[in-house]
Structure formats: structure tokens, C-alpha cells
Amino acid sequence: MIKTREWKNGFRLIYEQPKNNALISSIYTICDVGSVHESDDVRGGAHFIEHMCFKGTKKVPKTEDVYVKYDDIGAYMNATTDKRYTTYKLRVHDRYVHNCIDLMSDMLMNSTFKRTEFQKEEKVVIEESMRLQDNAESILEDLKESVIYKNSSYEYPIDTLSYHKTLFSYDKILELYHAFYRASRMILSIVTNIPFDDVIKMVNSSYYAKLYKANPSLDGILQSRVIQYSDILQTEPTYHIEKHKNLSTIHLNVTFRTCNYYSDDKYVLDLLKHLLSGMFGSRLSMLLRDKNGLTYHSSVTTNYYEHSGELSFYAQLTPSKILKNGAKPGVLPLIIGLINDLVKNGVSESELATAKRNINGKMLLVLEQSDSQSLHNGINYLLKRDVSKITPLNKVYDTHLKGISLHQINGIIRKYFIRNTMNVFIIGAELPNLEQVKHCCERLH
């Protein structure tokens, strides 16, 4: 059973017991700030703040002191900046949960943000951005989202090397930190064996429960950083081919616009994704790898934001095999052919039944660790706010997936796999001819 509690300062707690027998607690603090809250003069700021929260507080003044405290209790700690939120993750033995809540609340609420540490950490963030710049899938993802979510706050990358052509403004990043890292924009999501009332006591004694003085100027910053949405009415396919001379392979992405985070269509799309690429014998892998020997790495992915979403076919391949494989079709025409077959013939009863059994089994395996359970609860609580609208992770299959019919999944295929909402992205050193790519994709019904 999921339980929640909200404090006078707006801080929220969402709690659930684990579905395994391990004496391990999974703790996420989810901060309601991401790259979507940034203005042009502070791009990359949310990610930079995530780094700075590890640089010490008055109580724990040095980075090494923070790390030693976590190391001393055998805790696993990590953090991630997303477009919509920032997460701080902890896995630890139940006996040390109080230590972790106390330390994490201090880190996030009371970072000293020393200018000297800021200047050192900027070099580290640049190194991280350089690593992403060498990652073809990351480049392709940024390109895709700049098109699919154009004119919205989701258009911009979380961080990229271009943001660091000039040095960050210390004052502006610090201002962003103080505006967004406040109790009313934080959620503690915990999955633990510890009783709910005991967790409440731990939060009460932490900095999460502290009342802070109102600051009108910071409130003004929040009001100016409202997330911008854009519902683009796409009426024809788009093609985006970019040369990246250091890549030995081509990275291909065929993306269709789909539904938003709150739509029930996402469950049908996720099941379809699983059927197409989430199993050993899934359609995409069998077609490209087993039957034609064309790719080692291919996948179908889905993603949803508050206003829109997408489903993408992805493949990494040798440049010479994108359009042709000798006398046979190459990767792109095979993907287009697969989509045409899905639209015309749909999926079979046996495929649907296998996909359901498989996704149910994999969701049960996920519950062996409580991390997914904790993250699921926290993100849903952030975006839905109403706990009655949150389906516990162990109930998602029975509630949303088990009852999906053949009629539903084939209807979703026809609803979203439309040529006019298709977007094709290709990056590599050796690129195909644009007109040939268009000619191939025009075969989509």
C-alpha cells in the first residue's frame, strides 16, 4: 500500500514497502527542476547544480567528507538530471536510512556553493559533456528531441558542449539553485521495511522539514520559468541527415509522434514496443539480425512528456547497408516494410500473448530490487500529484497491460504509424543520398 505525507513547507513523502525480502531501502529525492526550467542564459544549469550538491555543506564541508559518510555505511549513491526533474538515488541497509535522509537533506538544502568549488567543477562538467559529444546515440537523441519538441521547453538538451563556450555565471546558477531547491519542490520516495511512522520521524528531524523564510525575488524566478509546451501539427514527414566525421557506423532513427504521459495509449504503445524489440524473438531483431544479418544493435523505444511523446525505431549499421544489402533491401527499407506490414496486417494473437507473458515476467524480475518501485512512485507523484491516480508498480501489468486486446493494439498501430507524422534521423561519416532516403520512406502507406 502506498502512503503519503505533506509537510507545512510543501515537502512531500511517498512510501511503500518492498516486494522482496531484502533488508535494503531504496531512497529517491526527486527535485522538481530540470533543463525545461532553464532560460537561454543558464542552459545546463540544472545539471551543474546536481554536481554542486556534492561539494559540501557547513555541517559536512568537503566533498570527500560527503563521500566518506556514504562509504562508511555501504550506501550506493548517484544522481541524474533529466529534462523534467533531477533525482538523487540511494540504496542502503535499512539500519542506515536515518543517516541517509539526514545527509541527503543537508546536501540538497544547504549546499555552500563555494565559488572556488564552482570553478573546479565546471571543468568536470565540460569533460562529461565532451564524453557525451563522443556518444553517437546521445547526439542522435538530442537531434531527435530538438525536432519532435521544437518550440517547447523540451527542445533543448540537458547539457551539451555548446553551453560551455562561455563560462557559466556563478551568480545565475546560484540563483537558480536557491529558487528551485526548496522543500515545496521536493519529494522523498522511499521503499523500505521501516514503518511509515518511523520514516516520518526521520524526515521531521531532517532539513527537509525545516521552514524557510519566504523570498519574493526567488518566487519571481519560479514564475518566469514556467514550462512551455507546443503541440506541433505535423503534416508531412521530415528528414534530418547530419555528417559526423568520426563515426564508423551510421545511426538511424525513425520516429513517430504519439501520446502524452497521461494518456492510456502509452500502455498499449509500451506493450507494442516490447513485442517489437523487448524479447529474444522480437520482430525487429529477428528481421534485421537473424533473417538478414544486418545489425548487431537495434531497438524500439518510447518516451512521454506532459504534452507529447514518441515511438522510435533505432538501428546502428554499416553505412553501405542502410538502403541496400547487395541485391536485397537494406535496413531502412526493411524497417519501412515492417511498419507497412504492421499497419496492414497488425500483430497476431500468439505474438500478443507471448509479449504479455514476457513483459509480466520481466516486471516481476524488476521487483527483485526496489529501485524501480521507488522511482516509479516518485515520478508519478510529481507529475500526477494525486496518489489515488498512481498504480503501484506491481499492479501495472494487471491494471493496464493484461487486458489489452488485439483490436486495441492494432488500432494503436494504425493511429500512430502515419507517414505524415514520421521523422527520419541519420547521422554518420558516410551518409546516404537524401532523395533516395525520401523515396524509400514514401513507400510507407
Where are these regions (language model features)?
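M16 family metallopeptidases and their MPP-like homologs
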Residues: 22-36, 45, 63-107, 139-163, ...
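Sec-exported extracytoplasmic/periplasmic mature domains
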Residues: 54, 71, 106-109, 130, ...
